[in-house]
Amino acid sequence: MATNYIFVTGGVVSSLGKGIAAASLAAILEARGLNVTIMKLDPYINVDPGTMSPTQHGEVFVTQDGAETDLDLGHYERFIRTKMTKRNNFTTGKIYSEVLRKERRGDYLGATIQVIPHITNEIKDRVIAGAQGHDVVIVEVGGTVGDIESLPFLEALRQLAVQVGREHTLFMHLTLVPYIPTAGEVKTKPTQHSVKELLSIGIQPDVLICRSDRMIPPNERAKIALFCNVAERAVISLKDVNSIYQIPALLKSQGLDDFVCERFRLTCPEADLTEWEQVLYKQANPVGEVTIGMVGKYTELPDAYKSVNEALKHAGLTNRLSVSIKYIDSQDVETKGVEVLKGVDGILVPGGFGYRGVEGKIRTAQYARENKIPYLGICLGMQIALIEYARNVAGLTKANSSEFDKDCEQPVVALITEWQDAEGNTEVRTDESDLGGTMRLGAQQCHLVSGSHARELYGKETIEERHRHRYEVNNTLLPQIEKAGLKVTGLSADKKLVEIIEVPNHPWFVACQFHPEFTSTPRDGHPLFAGFVKAAYENHKKSVK
């Protein structure tokens, strides 16, 4: 079967939910038995989002093969079974970097390098490479139509549609249809102008996804179809919903998947959305509730912890609980004290970088340990838990990480100088290494110690989880900390790197060096998050007695 391409663009304003719409359509097509993948093309000049501020860009999602990518790839993996790879996300910066590398190498035989054809050809080549082996590939273009940054991508997709044939391509455009209270009606003019902008660069959309706070009336959909030269059945109303997991059913109810299959002449069974119905049922019928305190430094933008937020919700589904997240700035713990932690049923310290707010996180771990509050530490959340235990229990009063104090006398956490990547190649790092693309990244095996919380939750000896860090537990000082009672319950494949620690004589205190949030899904959840939320609920029941 030839690969079919769905190109997703957005107009009028940003943040309309192109990623969610693309992932939801992919989920329906997957439920029809098709092999689907999704790609994200980002117009910014950064090579990848690895060094971008989380408060500007949101979280960095790490793929199985170690690519640092846009957070939308997290949505893709939560909606479909296909795992994303480095092929599923690339930026303008990465495209230009590769074209310039080829030019320096002489690949273009002295040609004058131009946006057309060299940049557009590189974009097309990457899209085609990422689509290999799939029935349908959905390609989302970041940004808004009309932005100068996205023009090379749109031109490349226009060319690709001609190259592979319009019978194998479909353009889906998301647009805003605002409701004006004073007029008492929705307005279609922004959509018409957005489509006009697309037409000016040679793209005629085949499907319009109309975002609004309400369903678009049939007469307005007919008007949009007429003025935008789109079939009326291809004008889809996408209203605001309580849960993003309602969107697959909402799109299916309007026949979007049927339209796509007919367009590509695909014969496949009806979509079975039973799993999504079960997710929604659990979400709508919780048997209890818990409040999780998330202590971090990027709390002003929840998207900075997008996968953690979603993983907590998934754990709620697994336990039939409603999970409320209380965001706590770690600097507030430093300035206002542990009073800001009162009233939560469990405490989670997610990953992060840099010194700001670290002492607040260390005090948070101490508070959770001493007050028997369920604690889950992720990446930096494990490192600060280790520092706290070393200082206050193991007698290493000057314990710290060399990330925060390069002249630390007792560096219980230090820079990884050498390790093997997924392909077995030796990676070497120093303090002088670039920040971008120089971490321990991607899926790594971990061996679990029997009798531990981790082993009980996972139910197996060897697991695989994704990493994103450049500092590790210092094995030189580890024996003294273990002697004081801390349990190392997870080790890397070569048994040299600490992956999981647990505090004994505590209801639930588990911290891991990897990022379990990246593999949590609404249908399957994740063992560590499920165990953590369950323990938080047990703590909640004690507190209300």
UniProtKB/Swiss-Prot annotation:
One of its GO terms (cellular component) is cytosol. Transmembrane segments: none annotated. The active site is at C379 (nucleophile), H515, E517. ATP binds at S15, L16, G17, K18, G19, I20, D72, K239, D240, V241. Pathway: Pyrimidine metabolism; CTP biosynthesis via de novo pathway; CTP from UDP: step 2/2. The keyword Nucleotidyltransferase does not apply. The keyword Metal-binding applies. UTP binds at S14, K187, T188, K189, P190, T191, Q192, K223. Keywords: ATP-binding, Glutamine amidotransferase, Ligase, Magnesium, Metal-binding, Nucleotide-binding, Pyrimidine biosynthesis. Residues 291-542 form the Glutamine amidotransferase type-1 domain. Mg(2+) binds at D72, E140. CTP binds at S14, D147, I148, E149, K187, T188, K189, P190, T191, Q192, K223. Its EC number is 6.3.4.2. Homotetramer. CTPSs have evolved a hybrid strategy for distinguishing between UTP and CTP. The overlapping regions of the product feedback inhibitory and substrate sites recognize a common feature in both compounds, the triphosphate moiety. To differentiate isosteric substrate and product pyrimidine rings, an additional pocket far from the expected kinase/ligase catalytic site, specifically recognizes the cytosine and ribose portions of the product inhibitor. Belongs to the CTP synthase family. This is CTP synthase. It comes from Haemophilus influenzae (strain 86-028NP). The gene is pyrG.
